[in-house]
Amino acid sequence: MSATLWADRDFVRLWIGQTSSQLGAQASQVTLPLIAVTTLGASAGQLGVLRAVQQAPILLFALYFGALVDRWRARHLMVLADFGRAVVLGAIPIAYLLGVLGLPWLYVVAFLTGICTVCFDVAYQASLPRLVARDQLAAGNSALEGSRSAAQICGPAVGGGLISLLTAPIAAVVGSAFFVVSFLSIRRIQRPDVLATTESPGGLVRQIRAGLLLVAGHTSLRTIVIASSLYQFSFAALMTAYLLFLSRTLELPGATLGLVLAAFGPGALLGSLLSASQPRRFGYGRVVIVAALVSDGAMLCLPAVHSSVVLLIAINFVFGTFSQTVDLATMVIRQTVTPLGLQGRVAATMNFLGLGLTPVGSLVGGALAAHFGTRTALLLAALGLCLSPVTFLLSPLRKLR
């Protein structure tokens, strides 16, 4: 990150808040499924339902929050989302100690945290272009995504370790604490959160339609959202099968499972560093395609693993490195070509269309694992991931400099 951004106290506060929020989210990604599997004895199908419930708010609320961000103060929505997640996750250990924790309760928690996460993510993506100059977007995104990578290192490891020490329901309180830190940091940002648009507010439907039309009509945005949809559907299926593969097929303890998943983080941190320089050197299109081929191809190796934790860590590291490169490069493309007044709606549209199939993917992953076993489910999901680089290859985006 440039010295100018480090000297910007408000950016640093955003960075701290985003990092804490990501730590909470990453820890929760481990603790919620493992509460279902280890404490409540959830089946493969029930785990798929849990992940689908957590991701369903993307379909239900992403476009609404996108329009809201462009009309309201983005940072106000971020702190509300942090507060909501802190309260909801903090209720898990209370329910456990009272003896009322069950799968229906966990489904409600997953759905409510999912709503808050959608709100935070849309507002966060729209807040950076309001806080820094356009020529600082690449450096700002690199710093923020680097912190997300650090969260991917620490979050699963912390979550998995605490599950071993405290049991999964009690460990959920850690995610709640991270969201409290994020809430306090973002609240301290002093720069006025100026509304991104001066146009007449109109109706939400009209504003949502403007975001959809821009994405549909812009070649680069349209290509990114198609590739993202294919990727996210397949990745959701893969992660549902992967959690079952690690916990039941390989029978890894919680701490080891957290360590394996945490390997995504250092790879993603390296990917953040690469994405700050390589696209300018080789061109955005070429970097996106090569990185997508390497990252998605690496996941094809998962079904062949039988006992090597080191090999699992290596696969996750490679995937983390190159998938992060793809994510950051496509994010810079999106933020650069999108007018400031449409940042929230375009971010929400991309999330809605790109992540909207993840609930279905989670259900498919659980069904495949239940009927064909986790190894076959992993193979089919990994093959689905490879459709993403094929989409980039067949589009004009491959020539983008």
Stretch-by-stretch model annotation:
Residues 30, 118-126, 131, 240, ...:
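Residues that mark transmembrane-helix kinks and helix-interface sites
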Residues 50, 59-63, 71, 75-78, ...:
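C-terminal transmembrane bundle of multi-pass solute transporters/carriers
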Residues 136, 187-213:
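Flexible cytoplasmic inter-helical loops of multi-pass small-molecule transporters
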Residues 6, 24, 40, 69, ...:
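Short helix-loop-helix connector
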